[in-house]
A protein has these predicted regions:
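Sec-dependent N-terminal signal peptides
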Residues: 4-15
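Non-catalytic cap/lid and distal C-terminal segments of serine-dependent acyl enzymes
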Residues: 20-139
Length: 139
């Protein structure tokens, strides 16, 4: 019994060490909305080691009443997936905006933020693919 416990403990420790993706919490400034938007970025552990490599990137959009942490709560294994699949995940927190530019609320320009502000901010900070060949959005 003691051997099984020790083996299980060592196995769990090894699994934890293998999954070492970086999970960053960022505040991306939006000039169009005049505020900072919270964003969680999950990137493979070695994303900065090969400067010539560009990682595919998936933008994960949360649902109504969610936030930038929603996808980590839904799928806690995202860091391990980022490492295994060599992919970056970006999770913006946009409140209950529906990701659109509002015609009623002047400073609710989330479509503008996503396309003109978030993508360039992510591409400046992380070595991700900068065109549709390596970019996806889902939610």
């Amino acid at each position: 019994m003691k051997r099984i416990f020790i083996f299980t403990f060592l196995l769990l420790l090894a699994v934890r060490v293998v999954s070492a993706a970086t999970v960053d919490t960022l505040a991306v400034h939006s000039p169009s909305m005049d505020r900072d938007v919270p964003v969680v970025a999950i990137v493979p552990a070695d994303y900065g080691q090969d400067t010539a490599r560009r990682w595919p990137v998936v933008y994960l959009l949360h649902g109504y009443s969610g936030d930038e942490t929603a996808w980590l709560k839904i799928k806690p294994s995202l860091p391990a997936i980022a490492d295994r699949e060599r992919i970056a995940f970006i999770c913006p927190g946009v409140g209950n905006s529906w990701y659109l530019d509002s015609k009623v609320r002047e400073k609710s320009l989330y479509e503008t933020f996503m396309i003109r502000e978030l993508l360039p901010a992510v591409e400046a900070r992380y070595p991700v693919v900068r065109d549709r060949s390596g970019r996806a959005i889902t939610g």
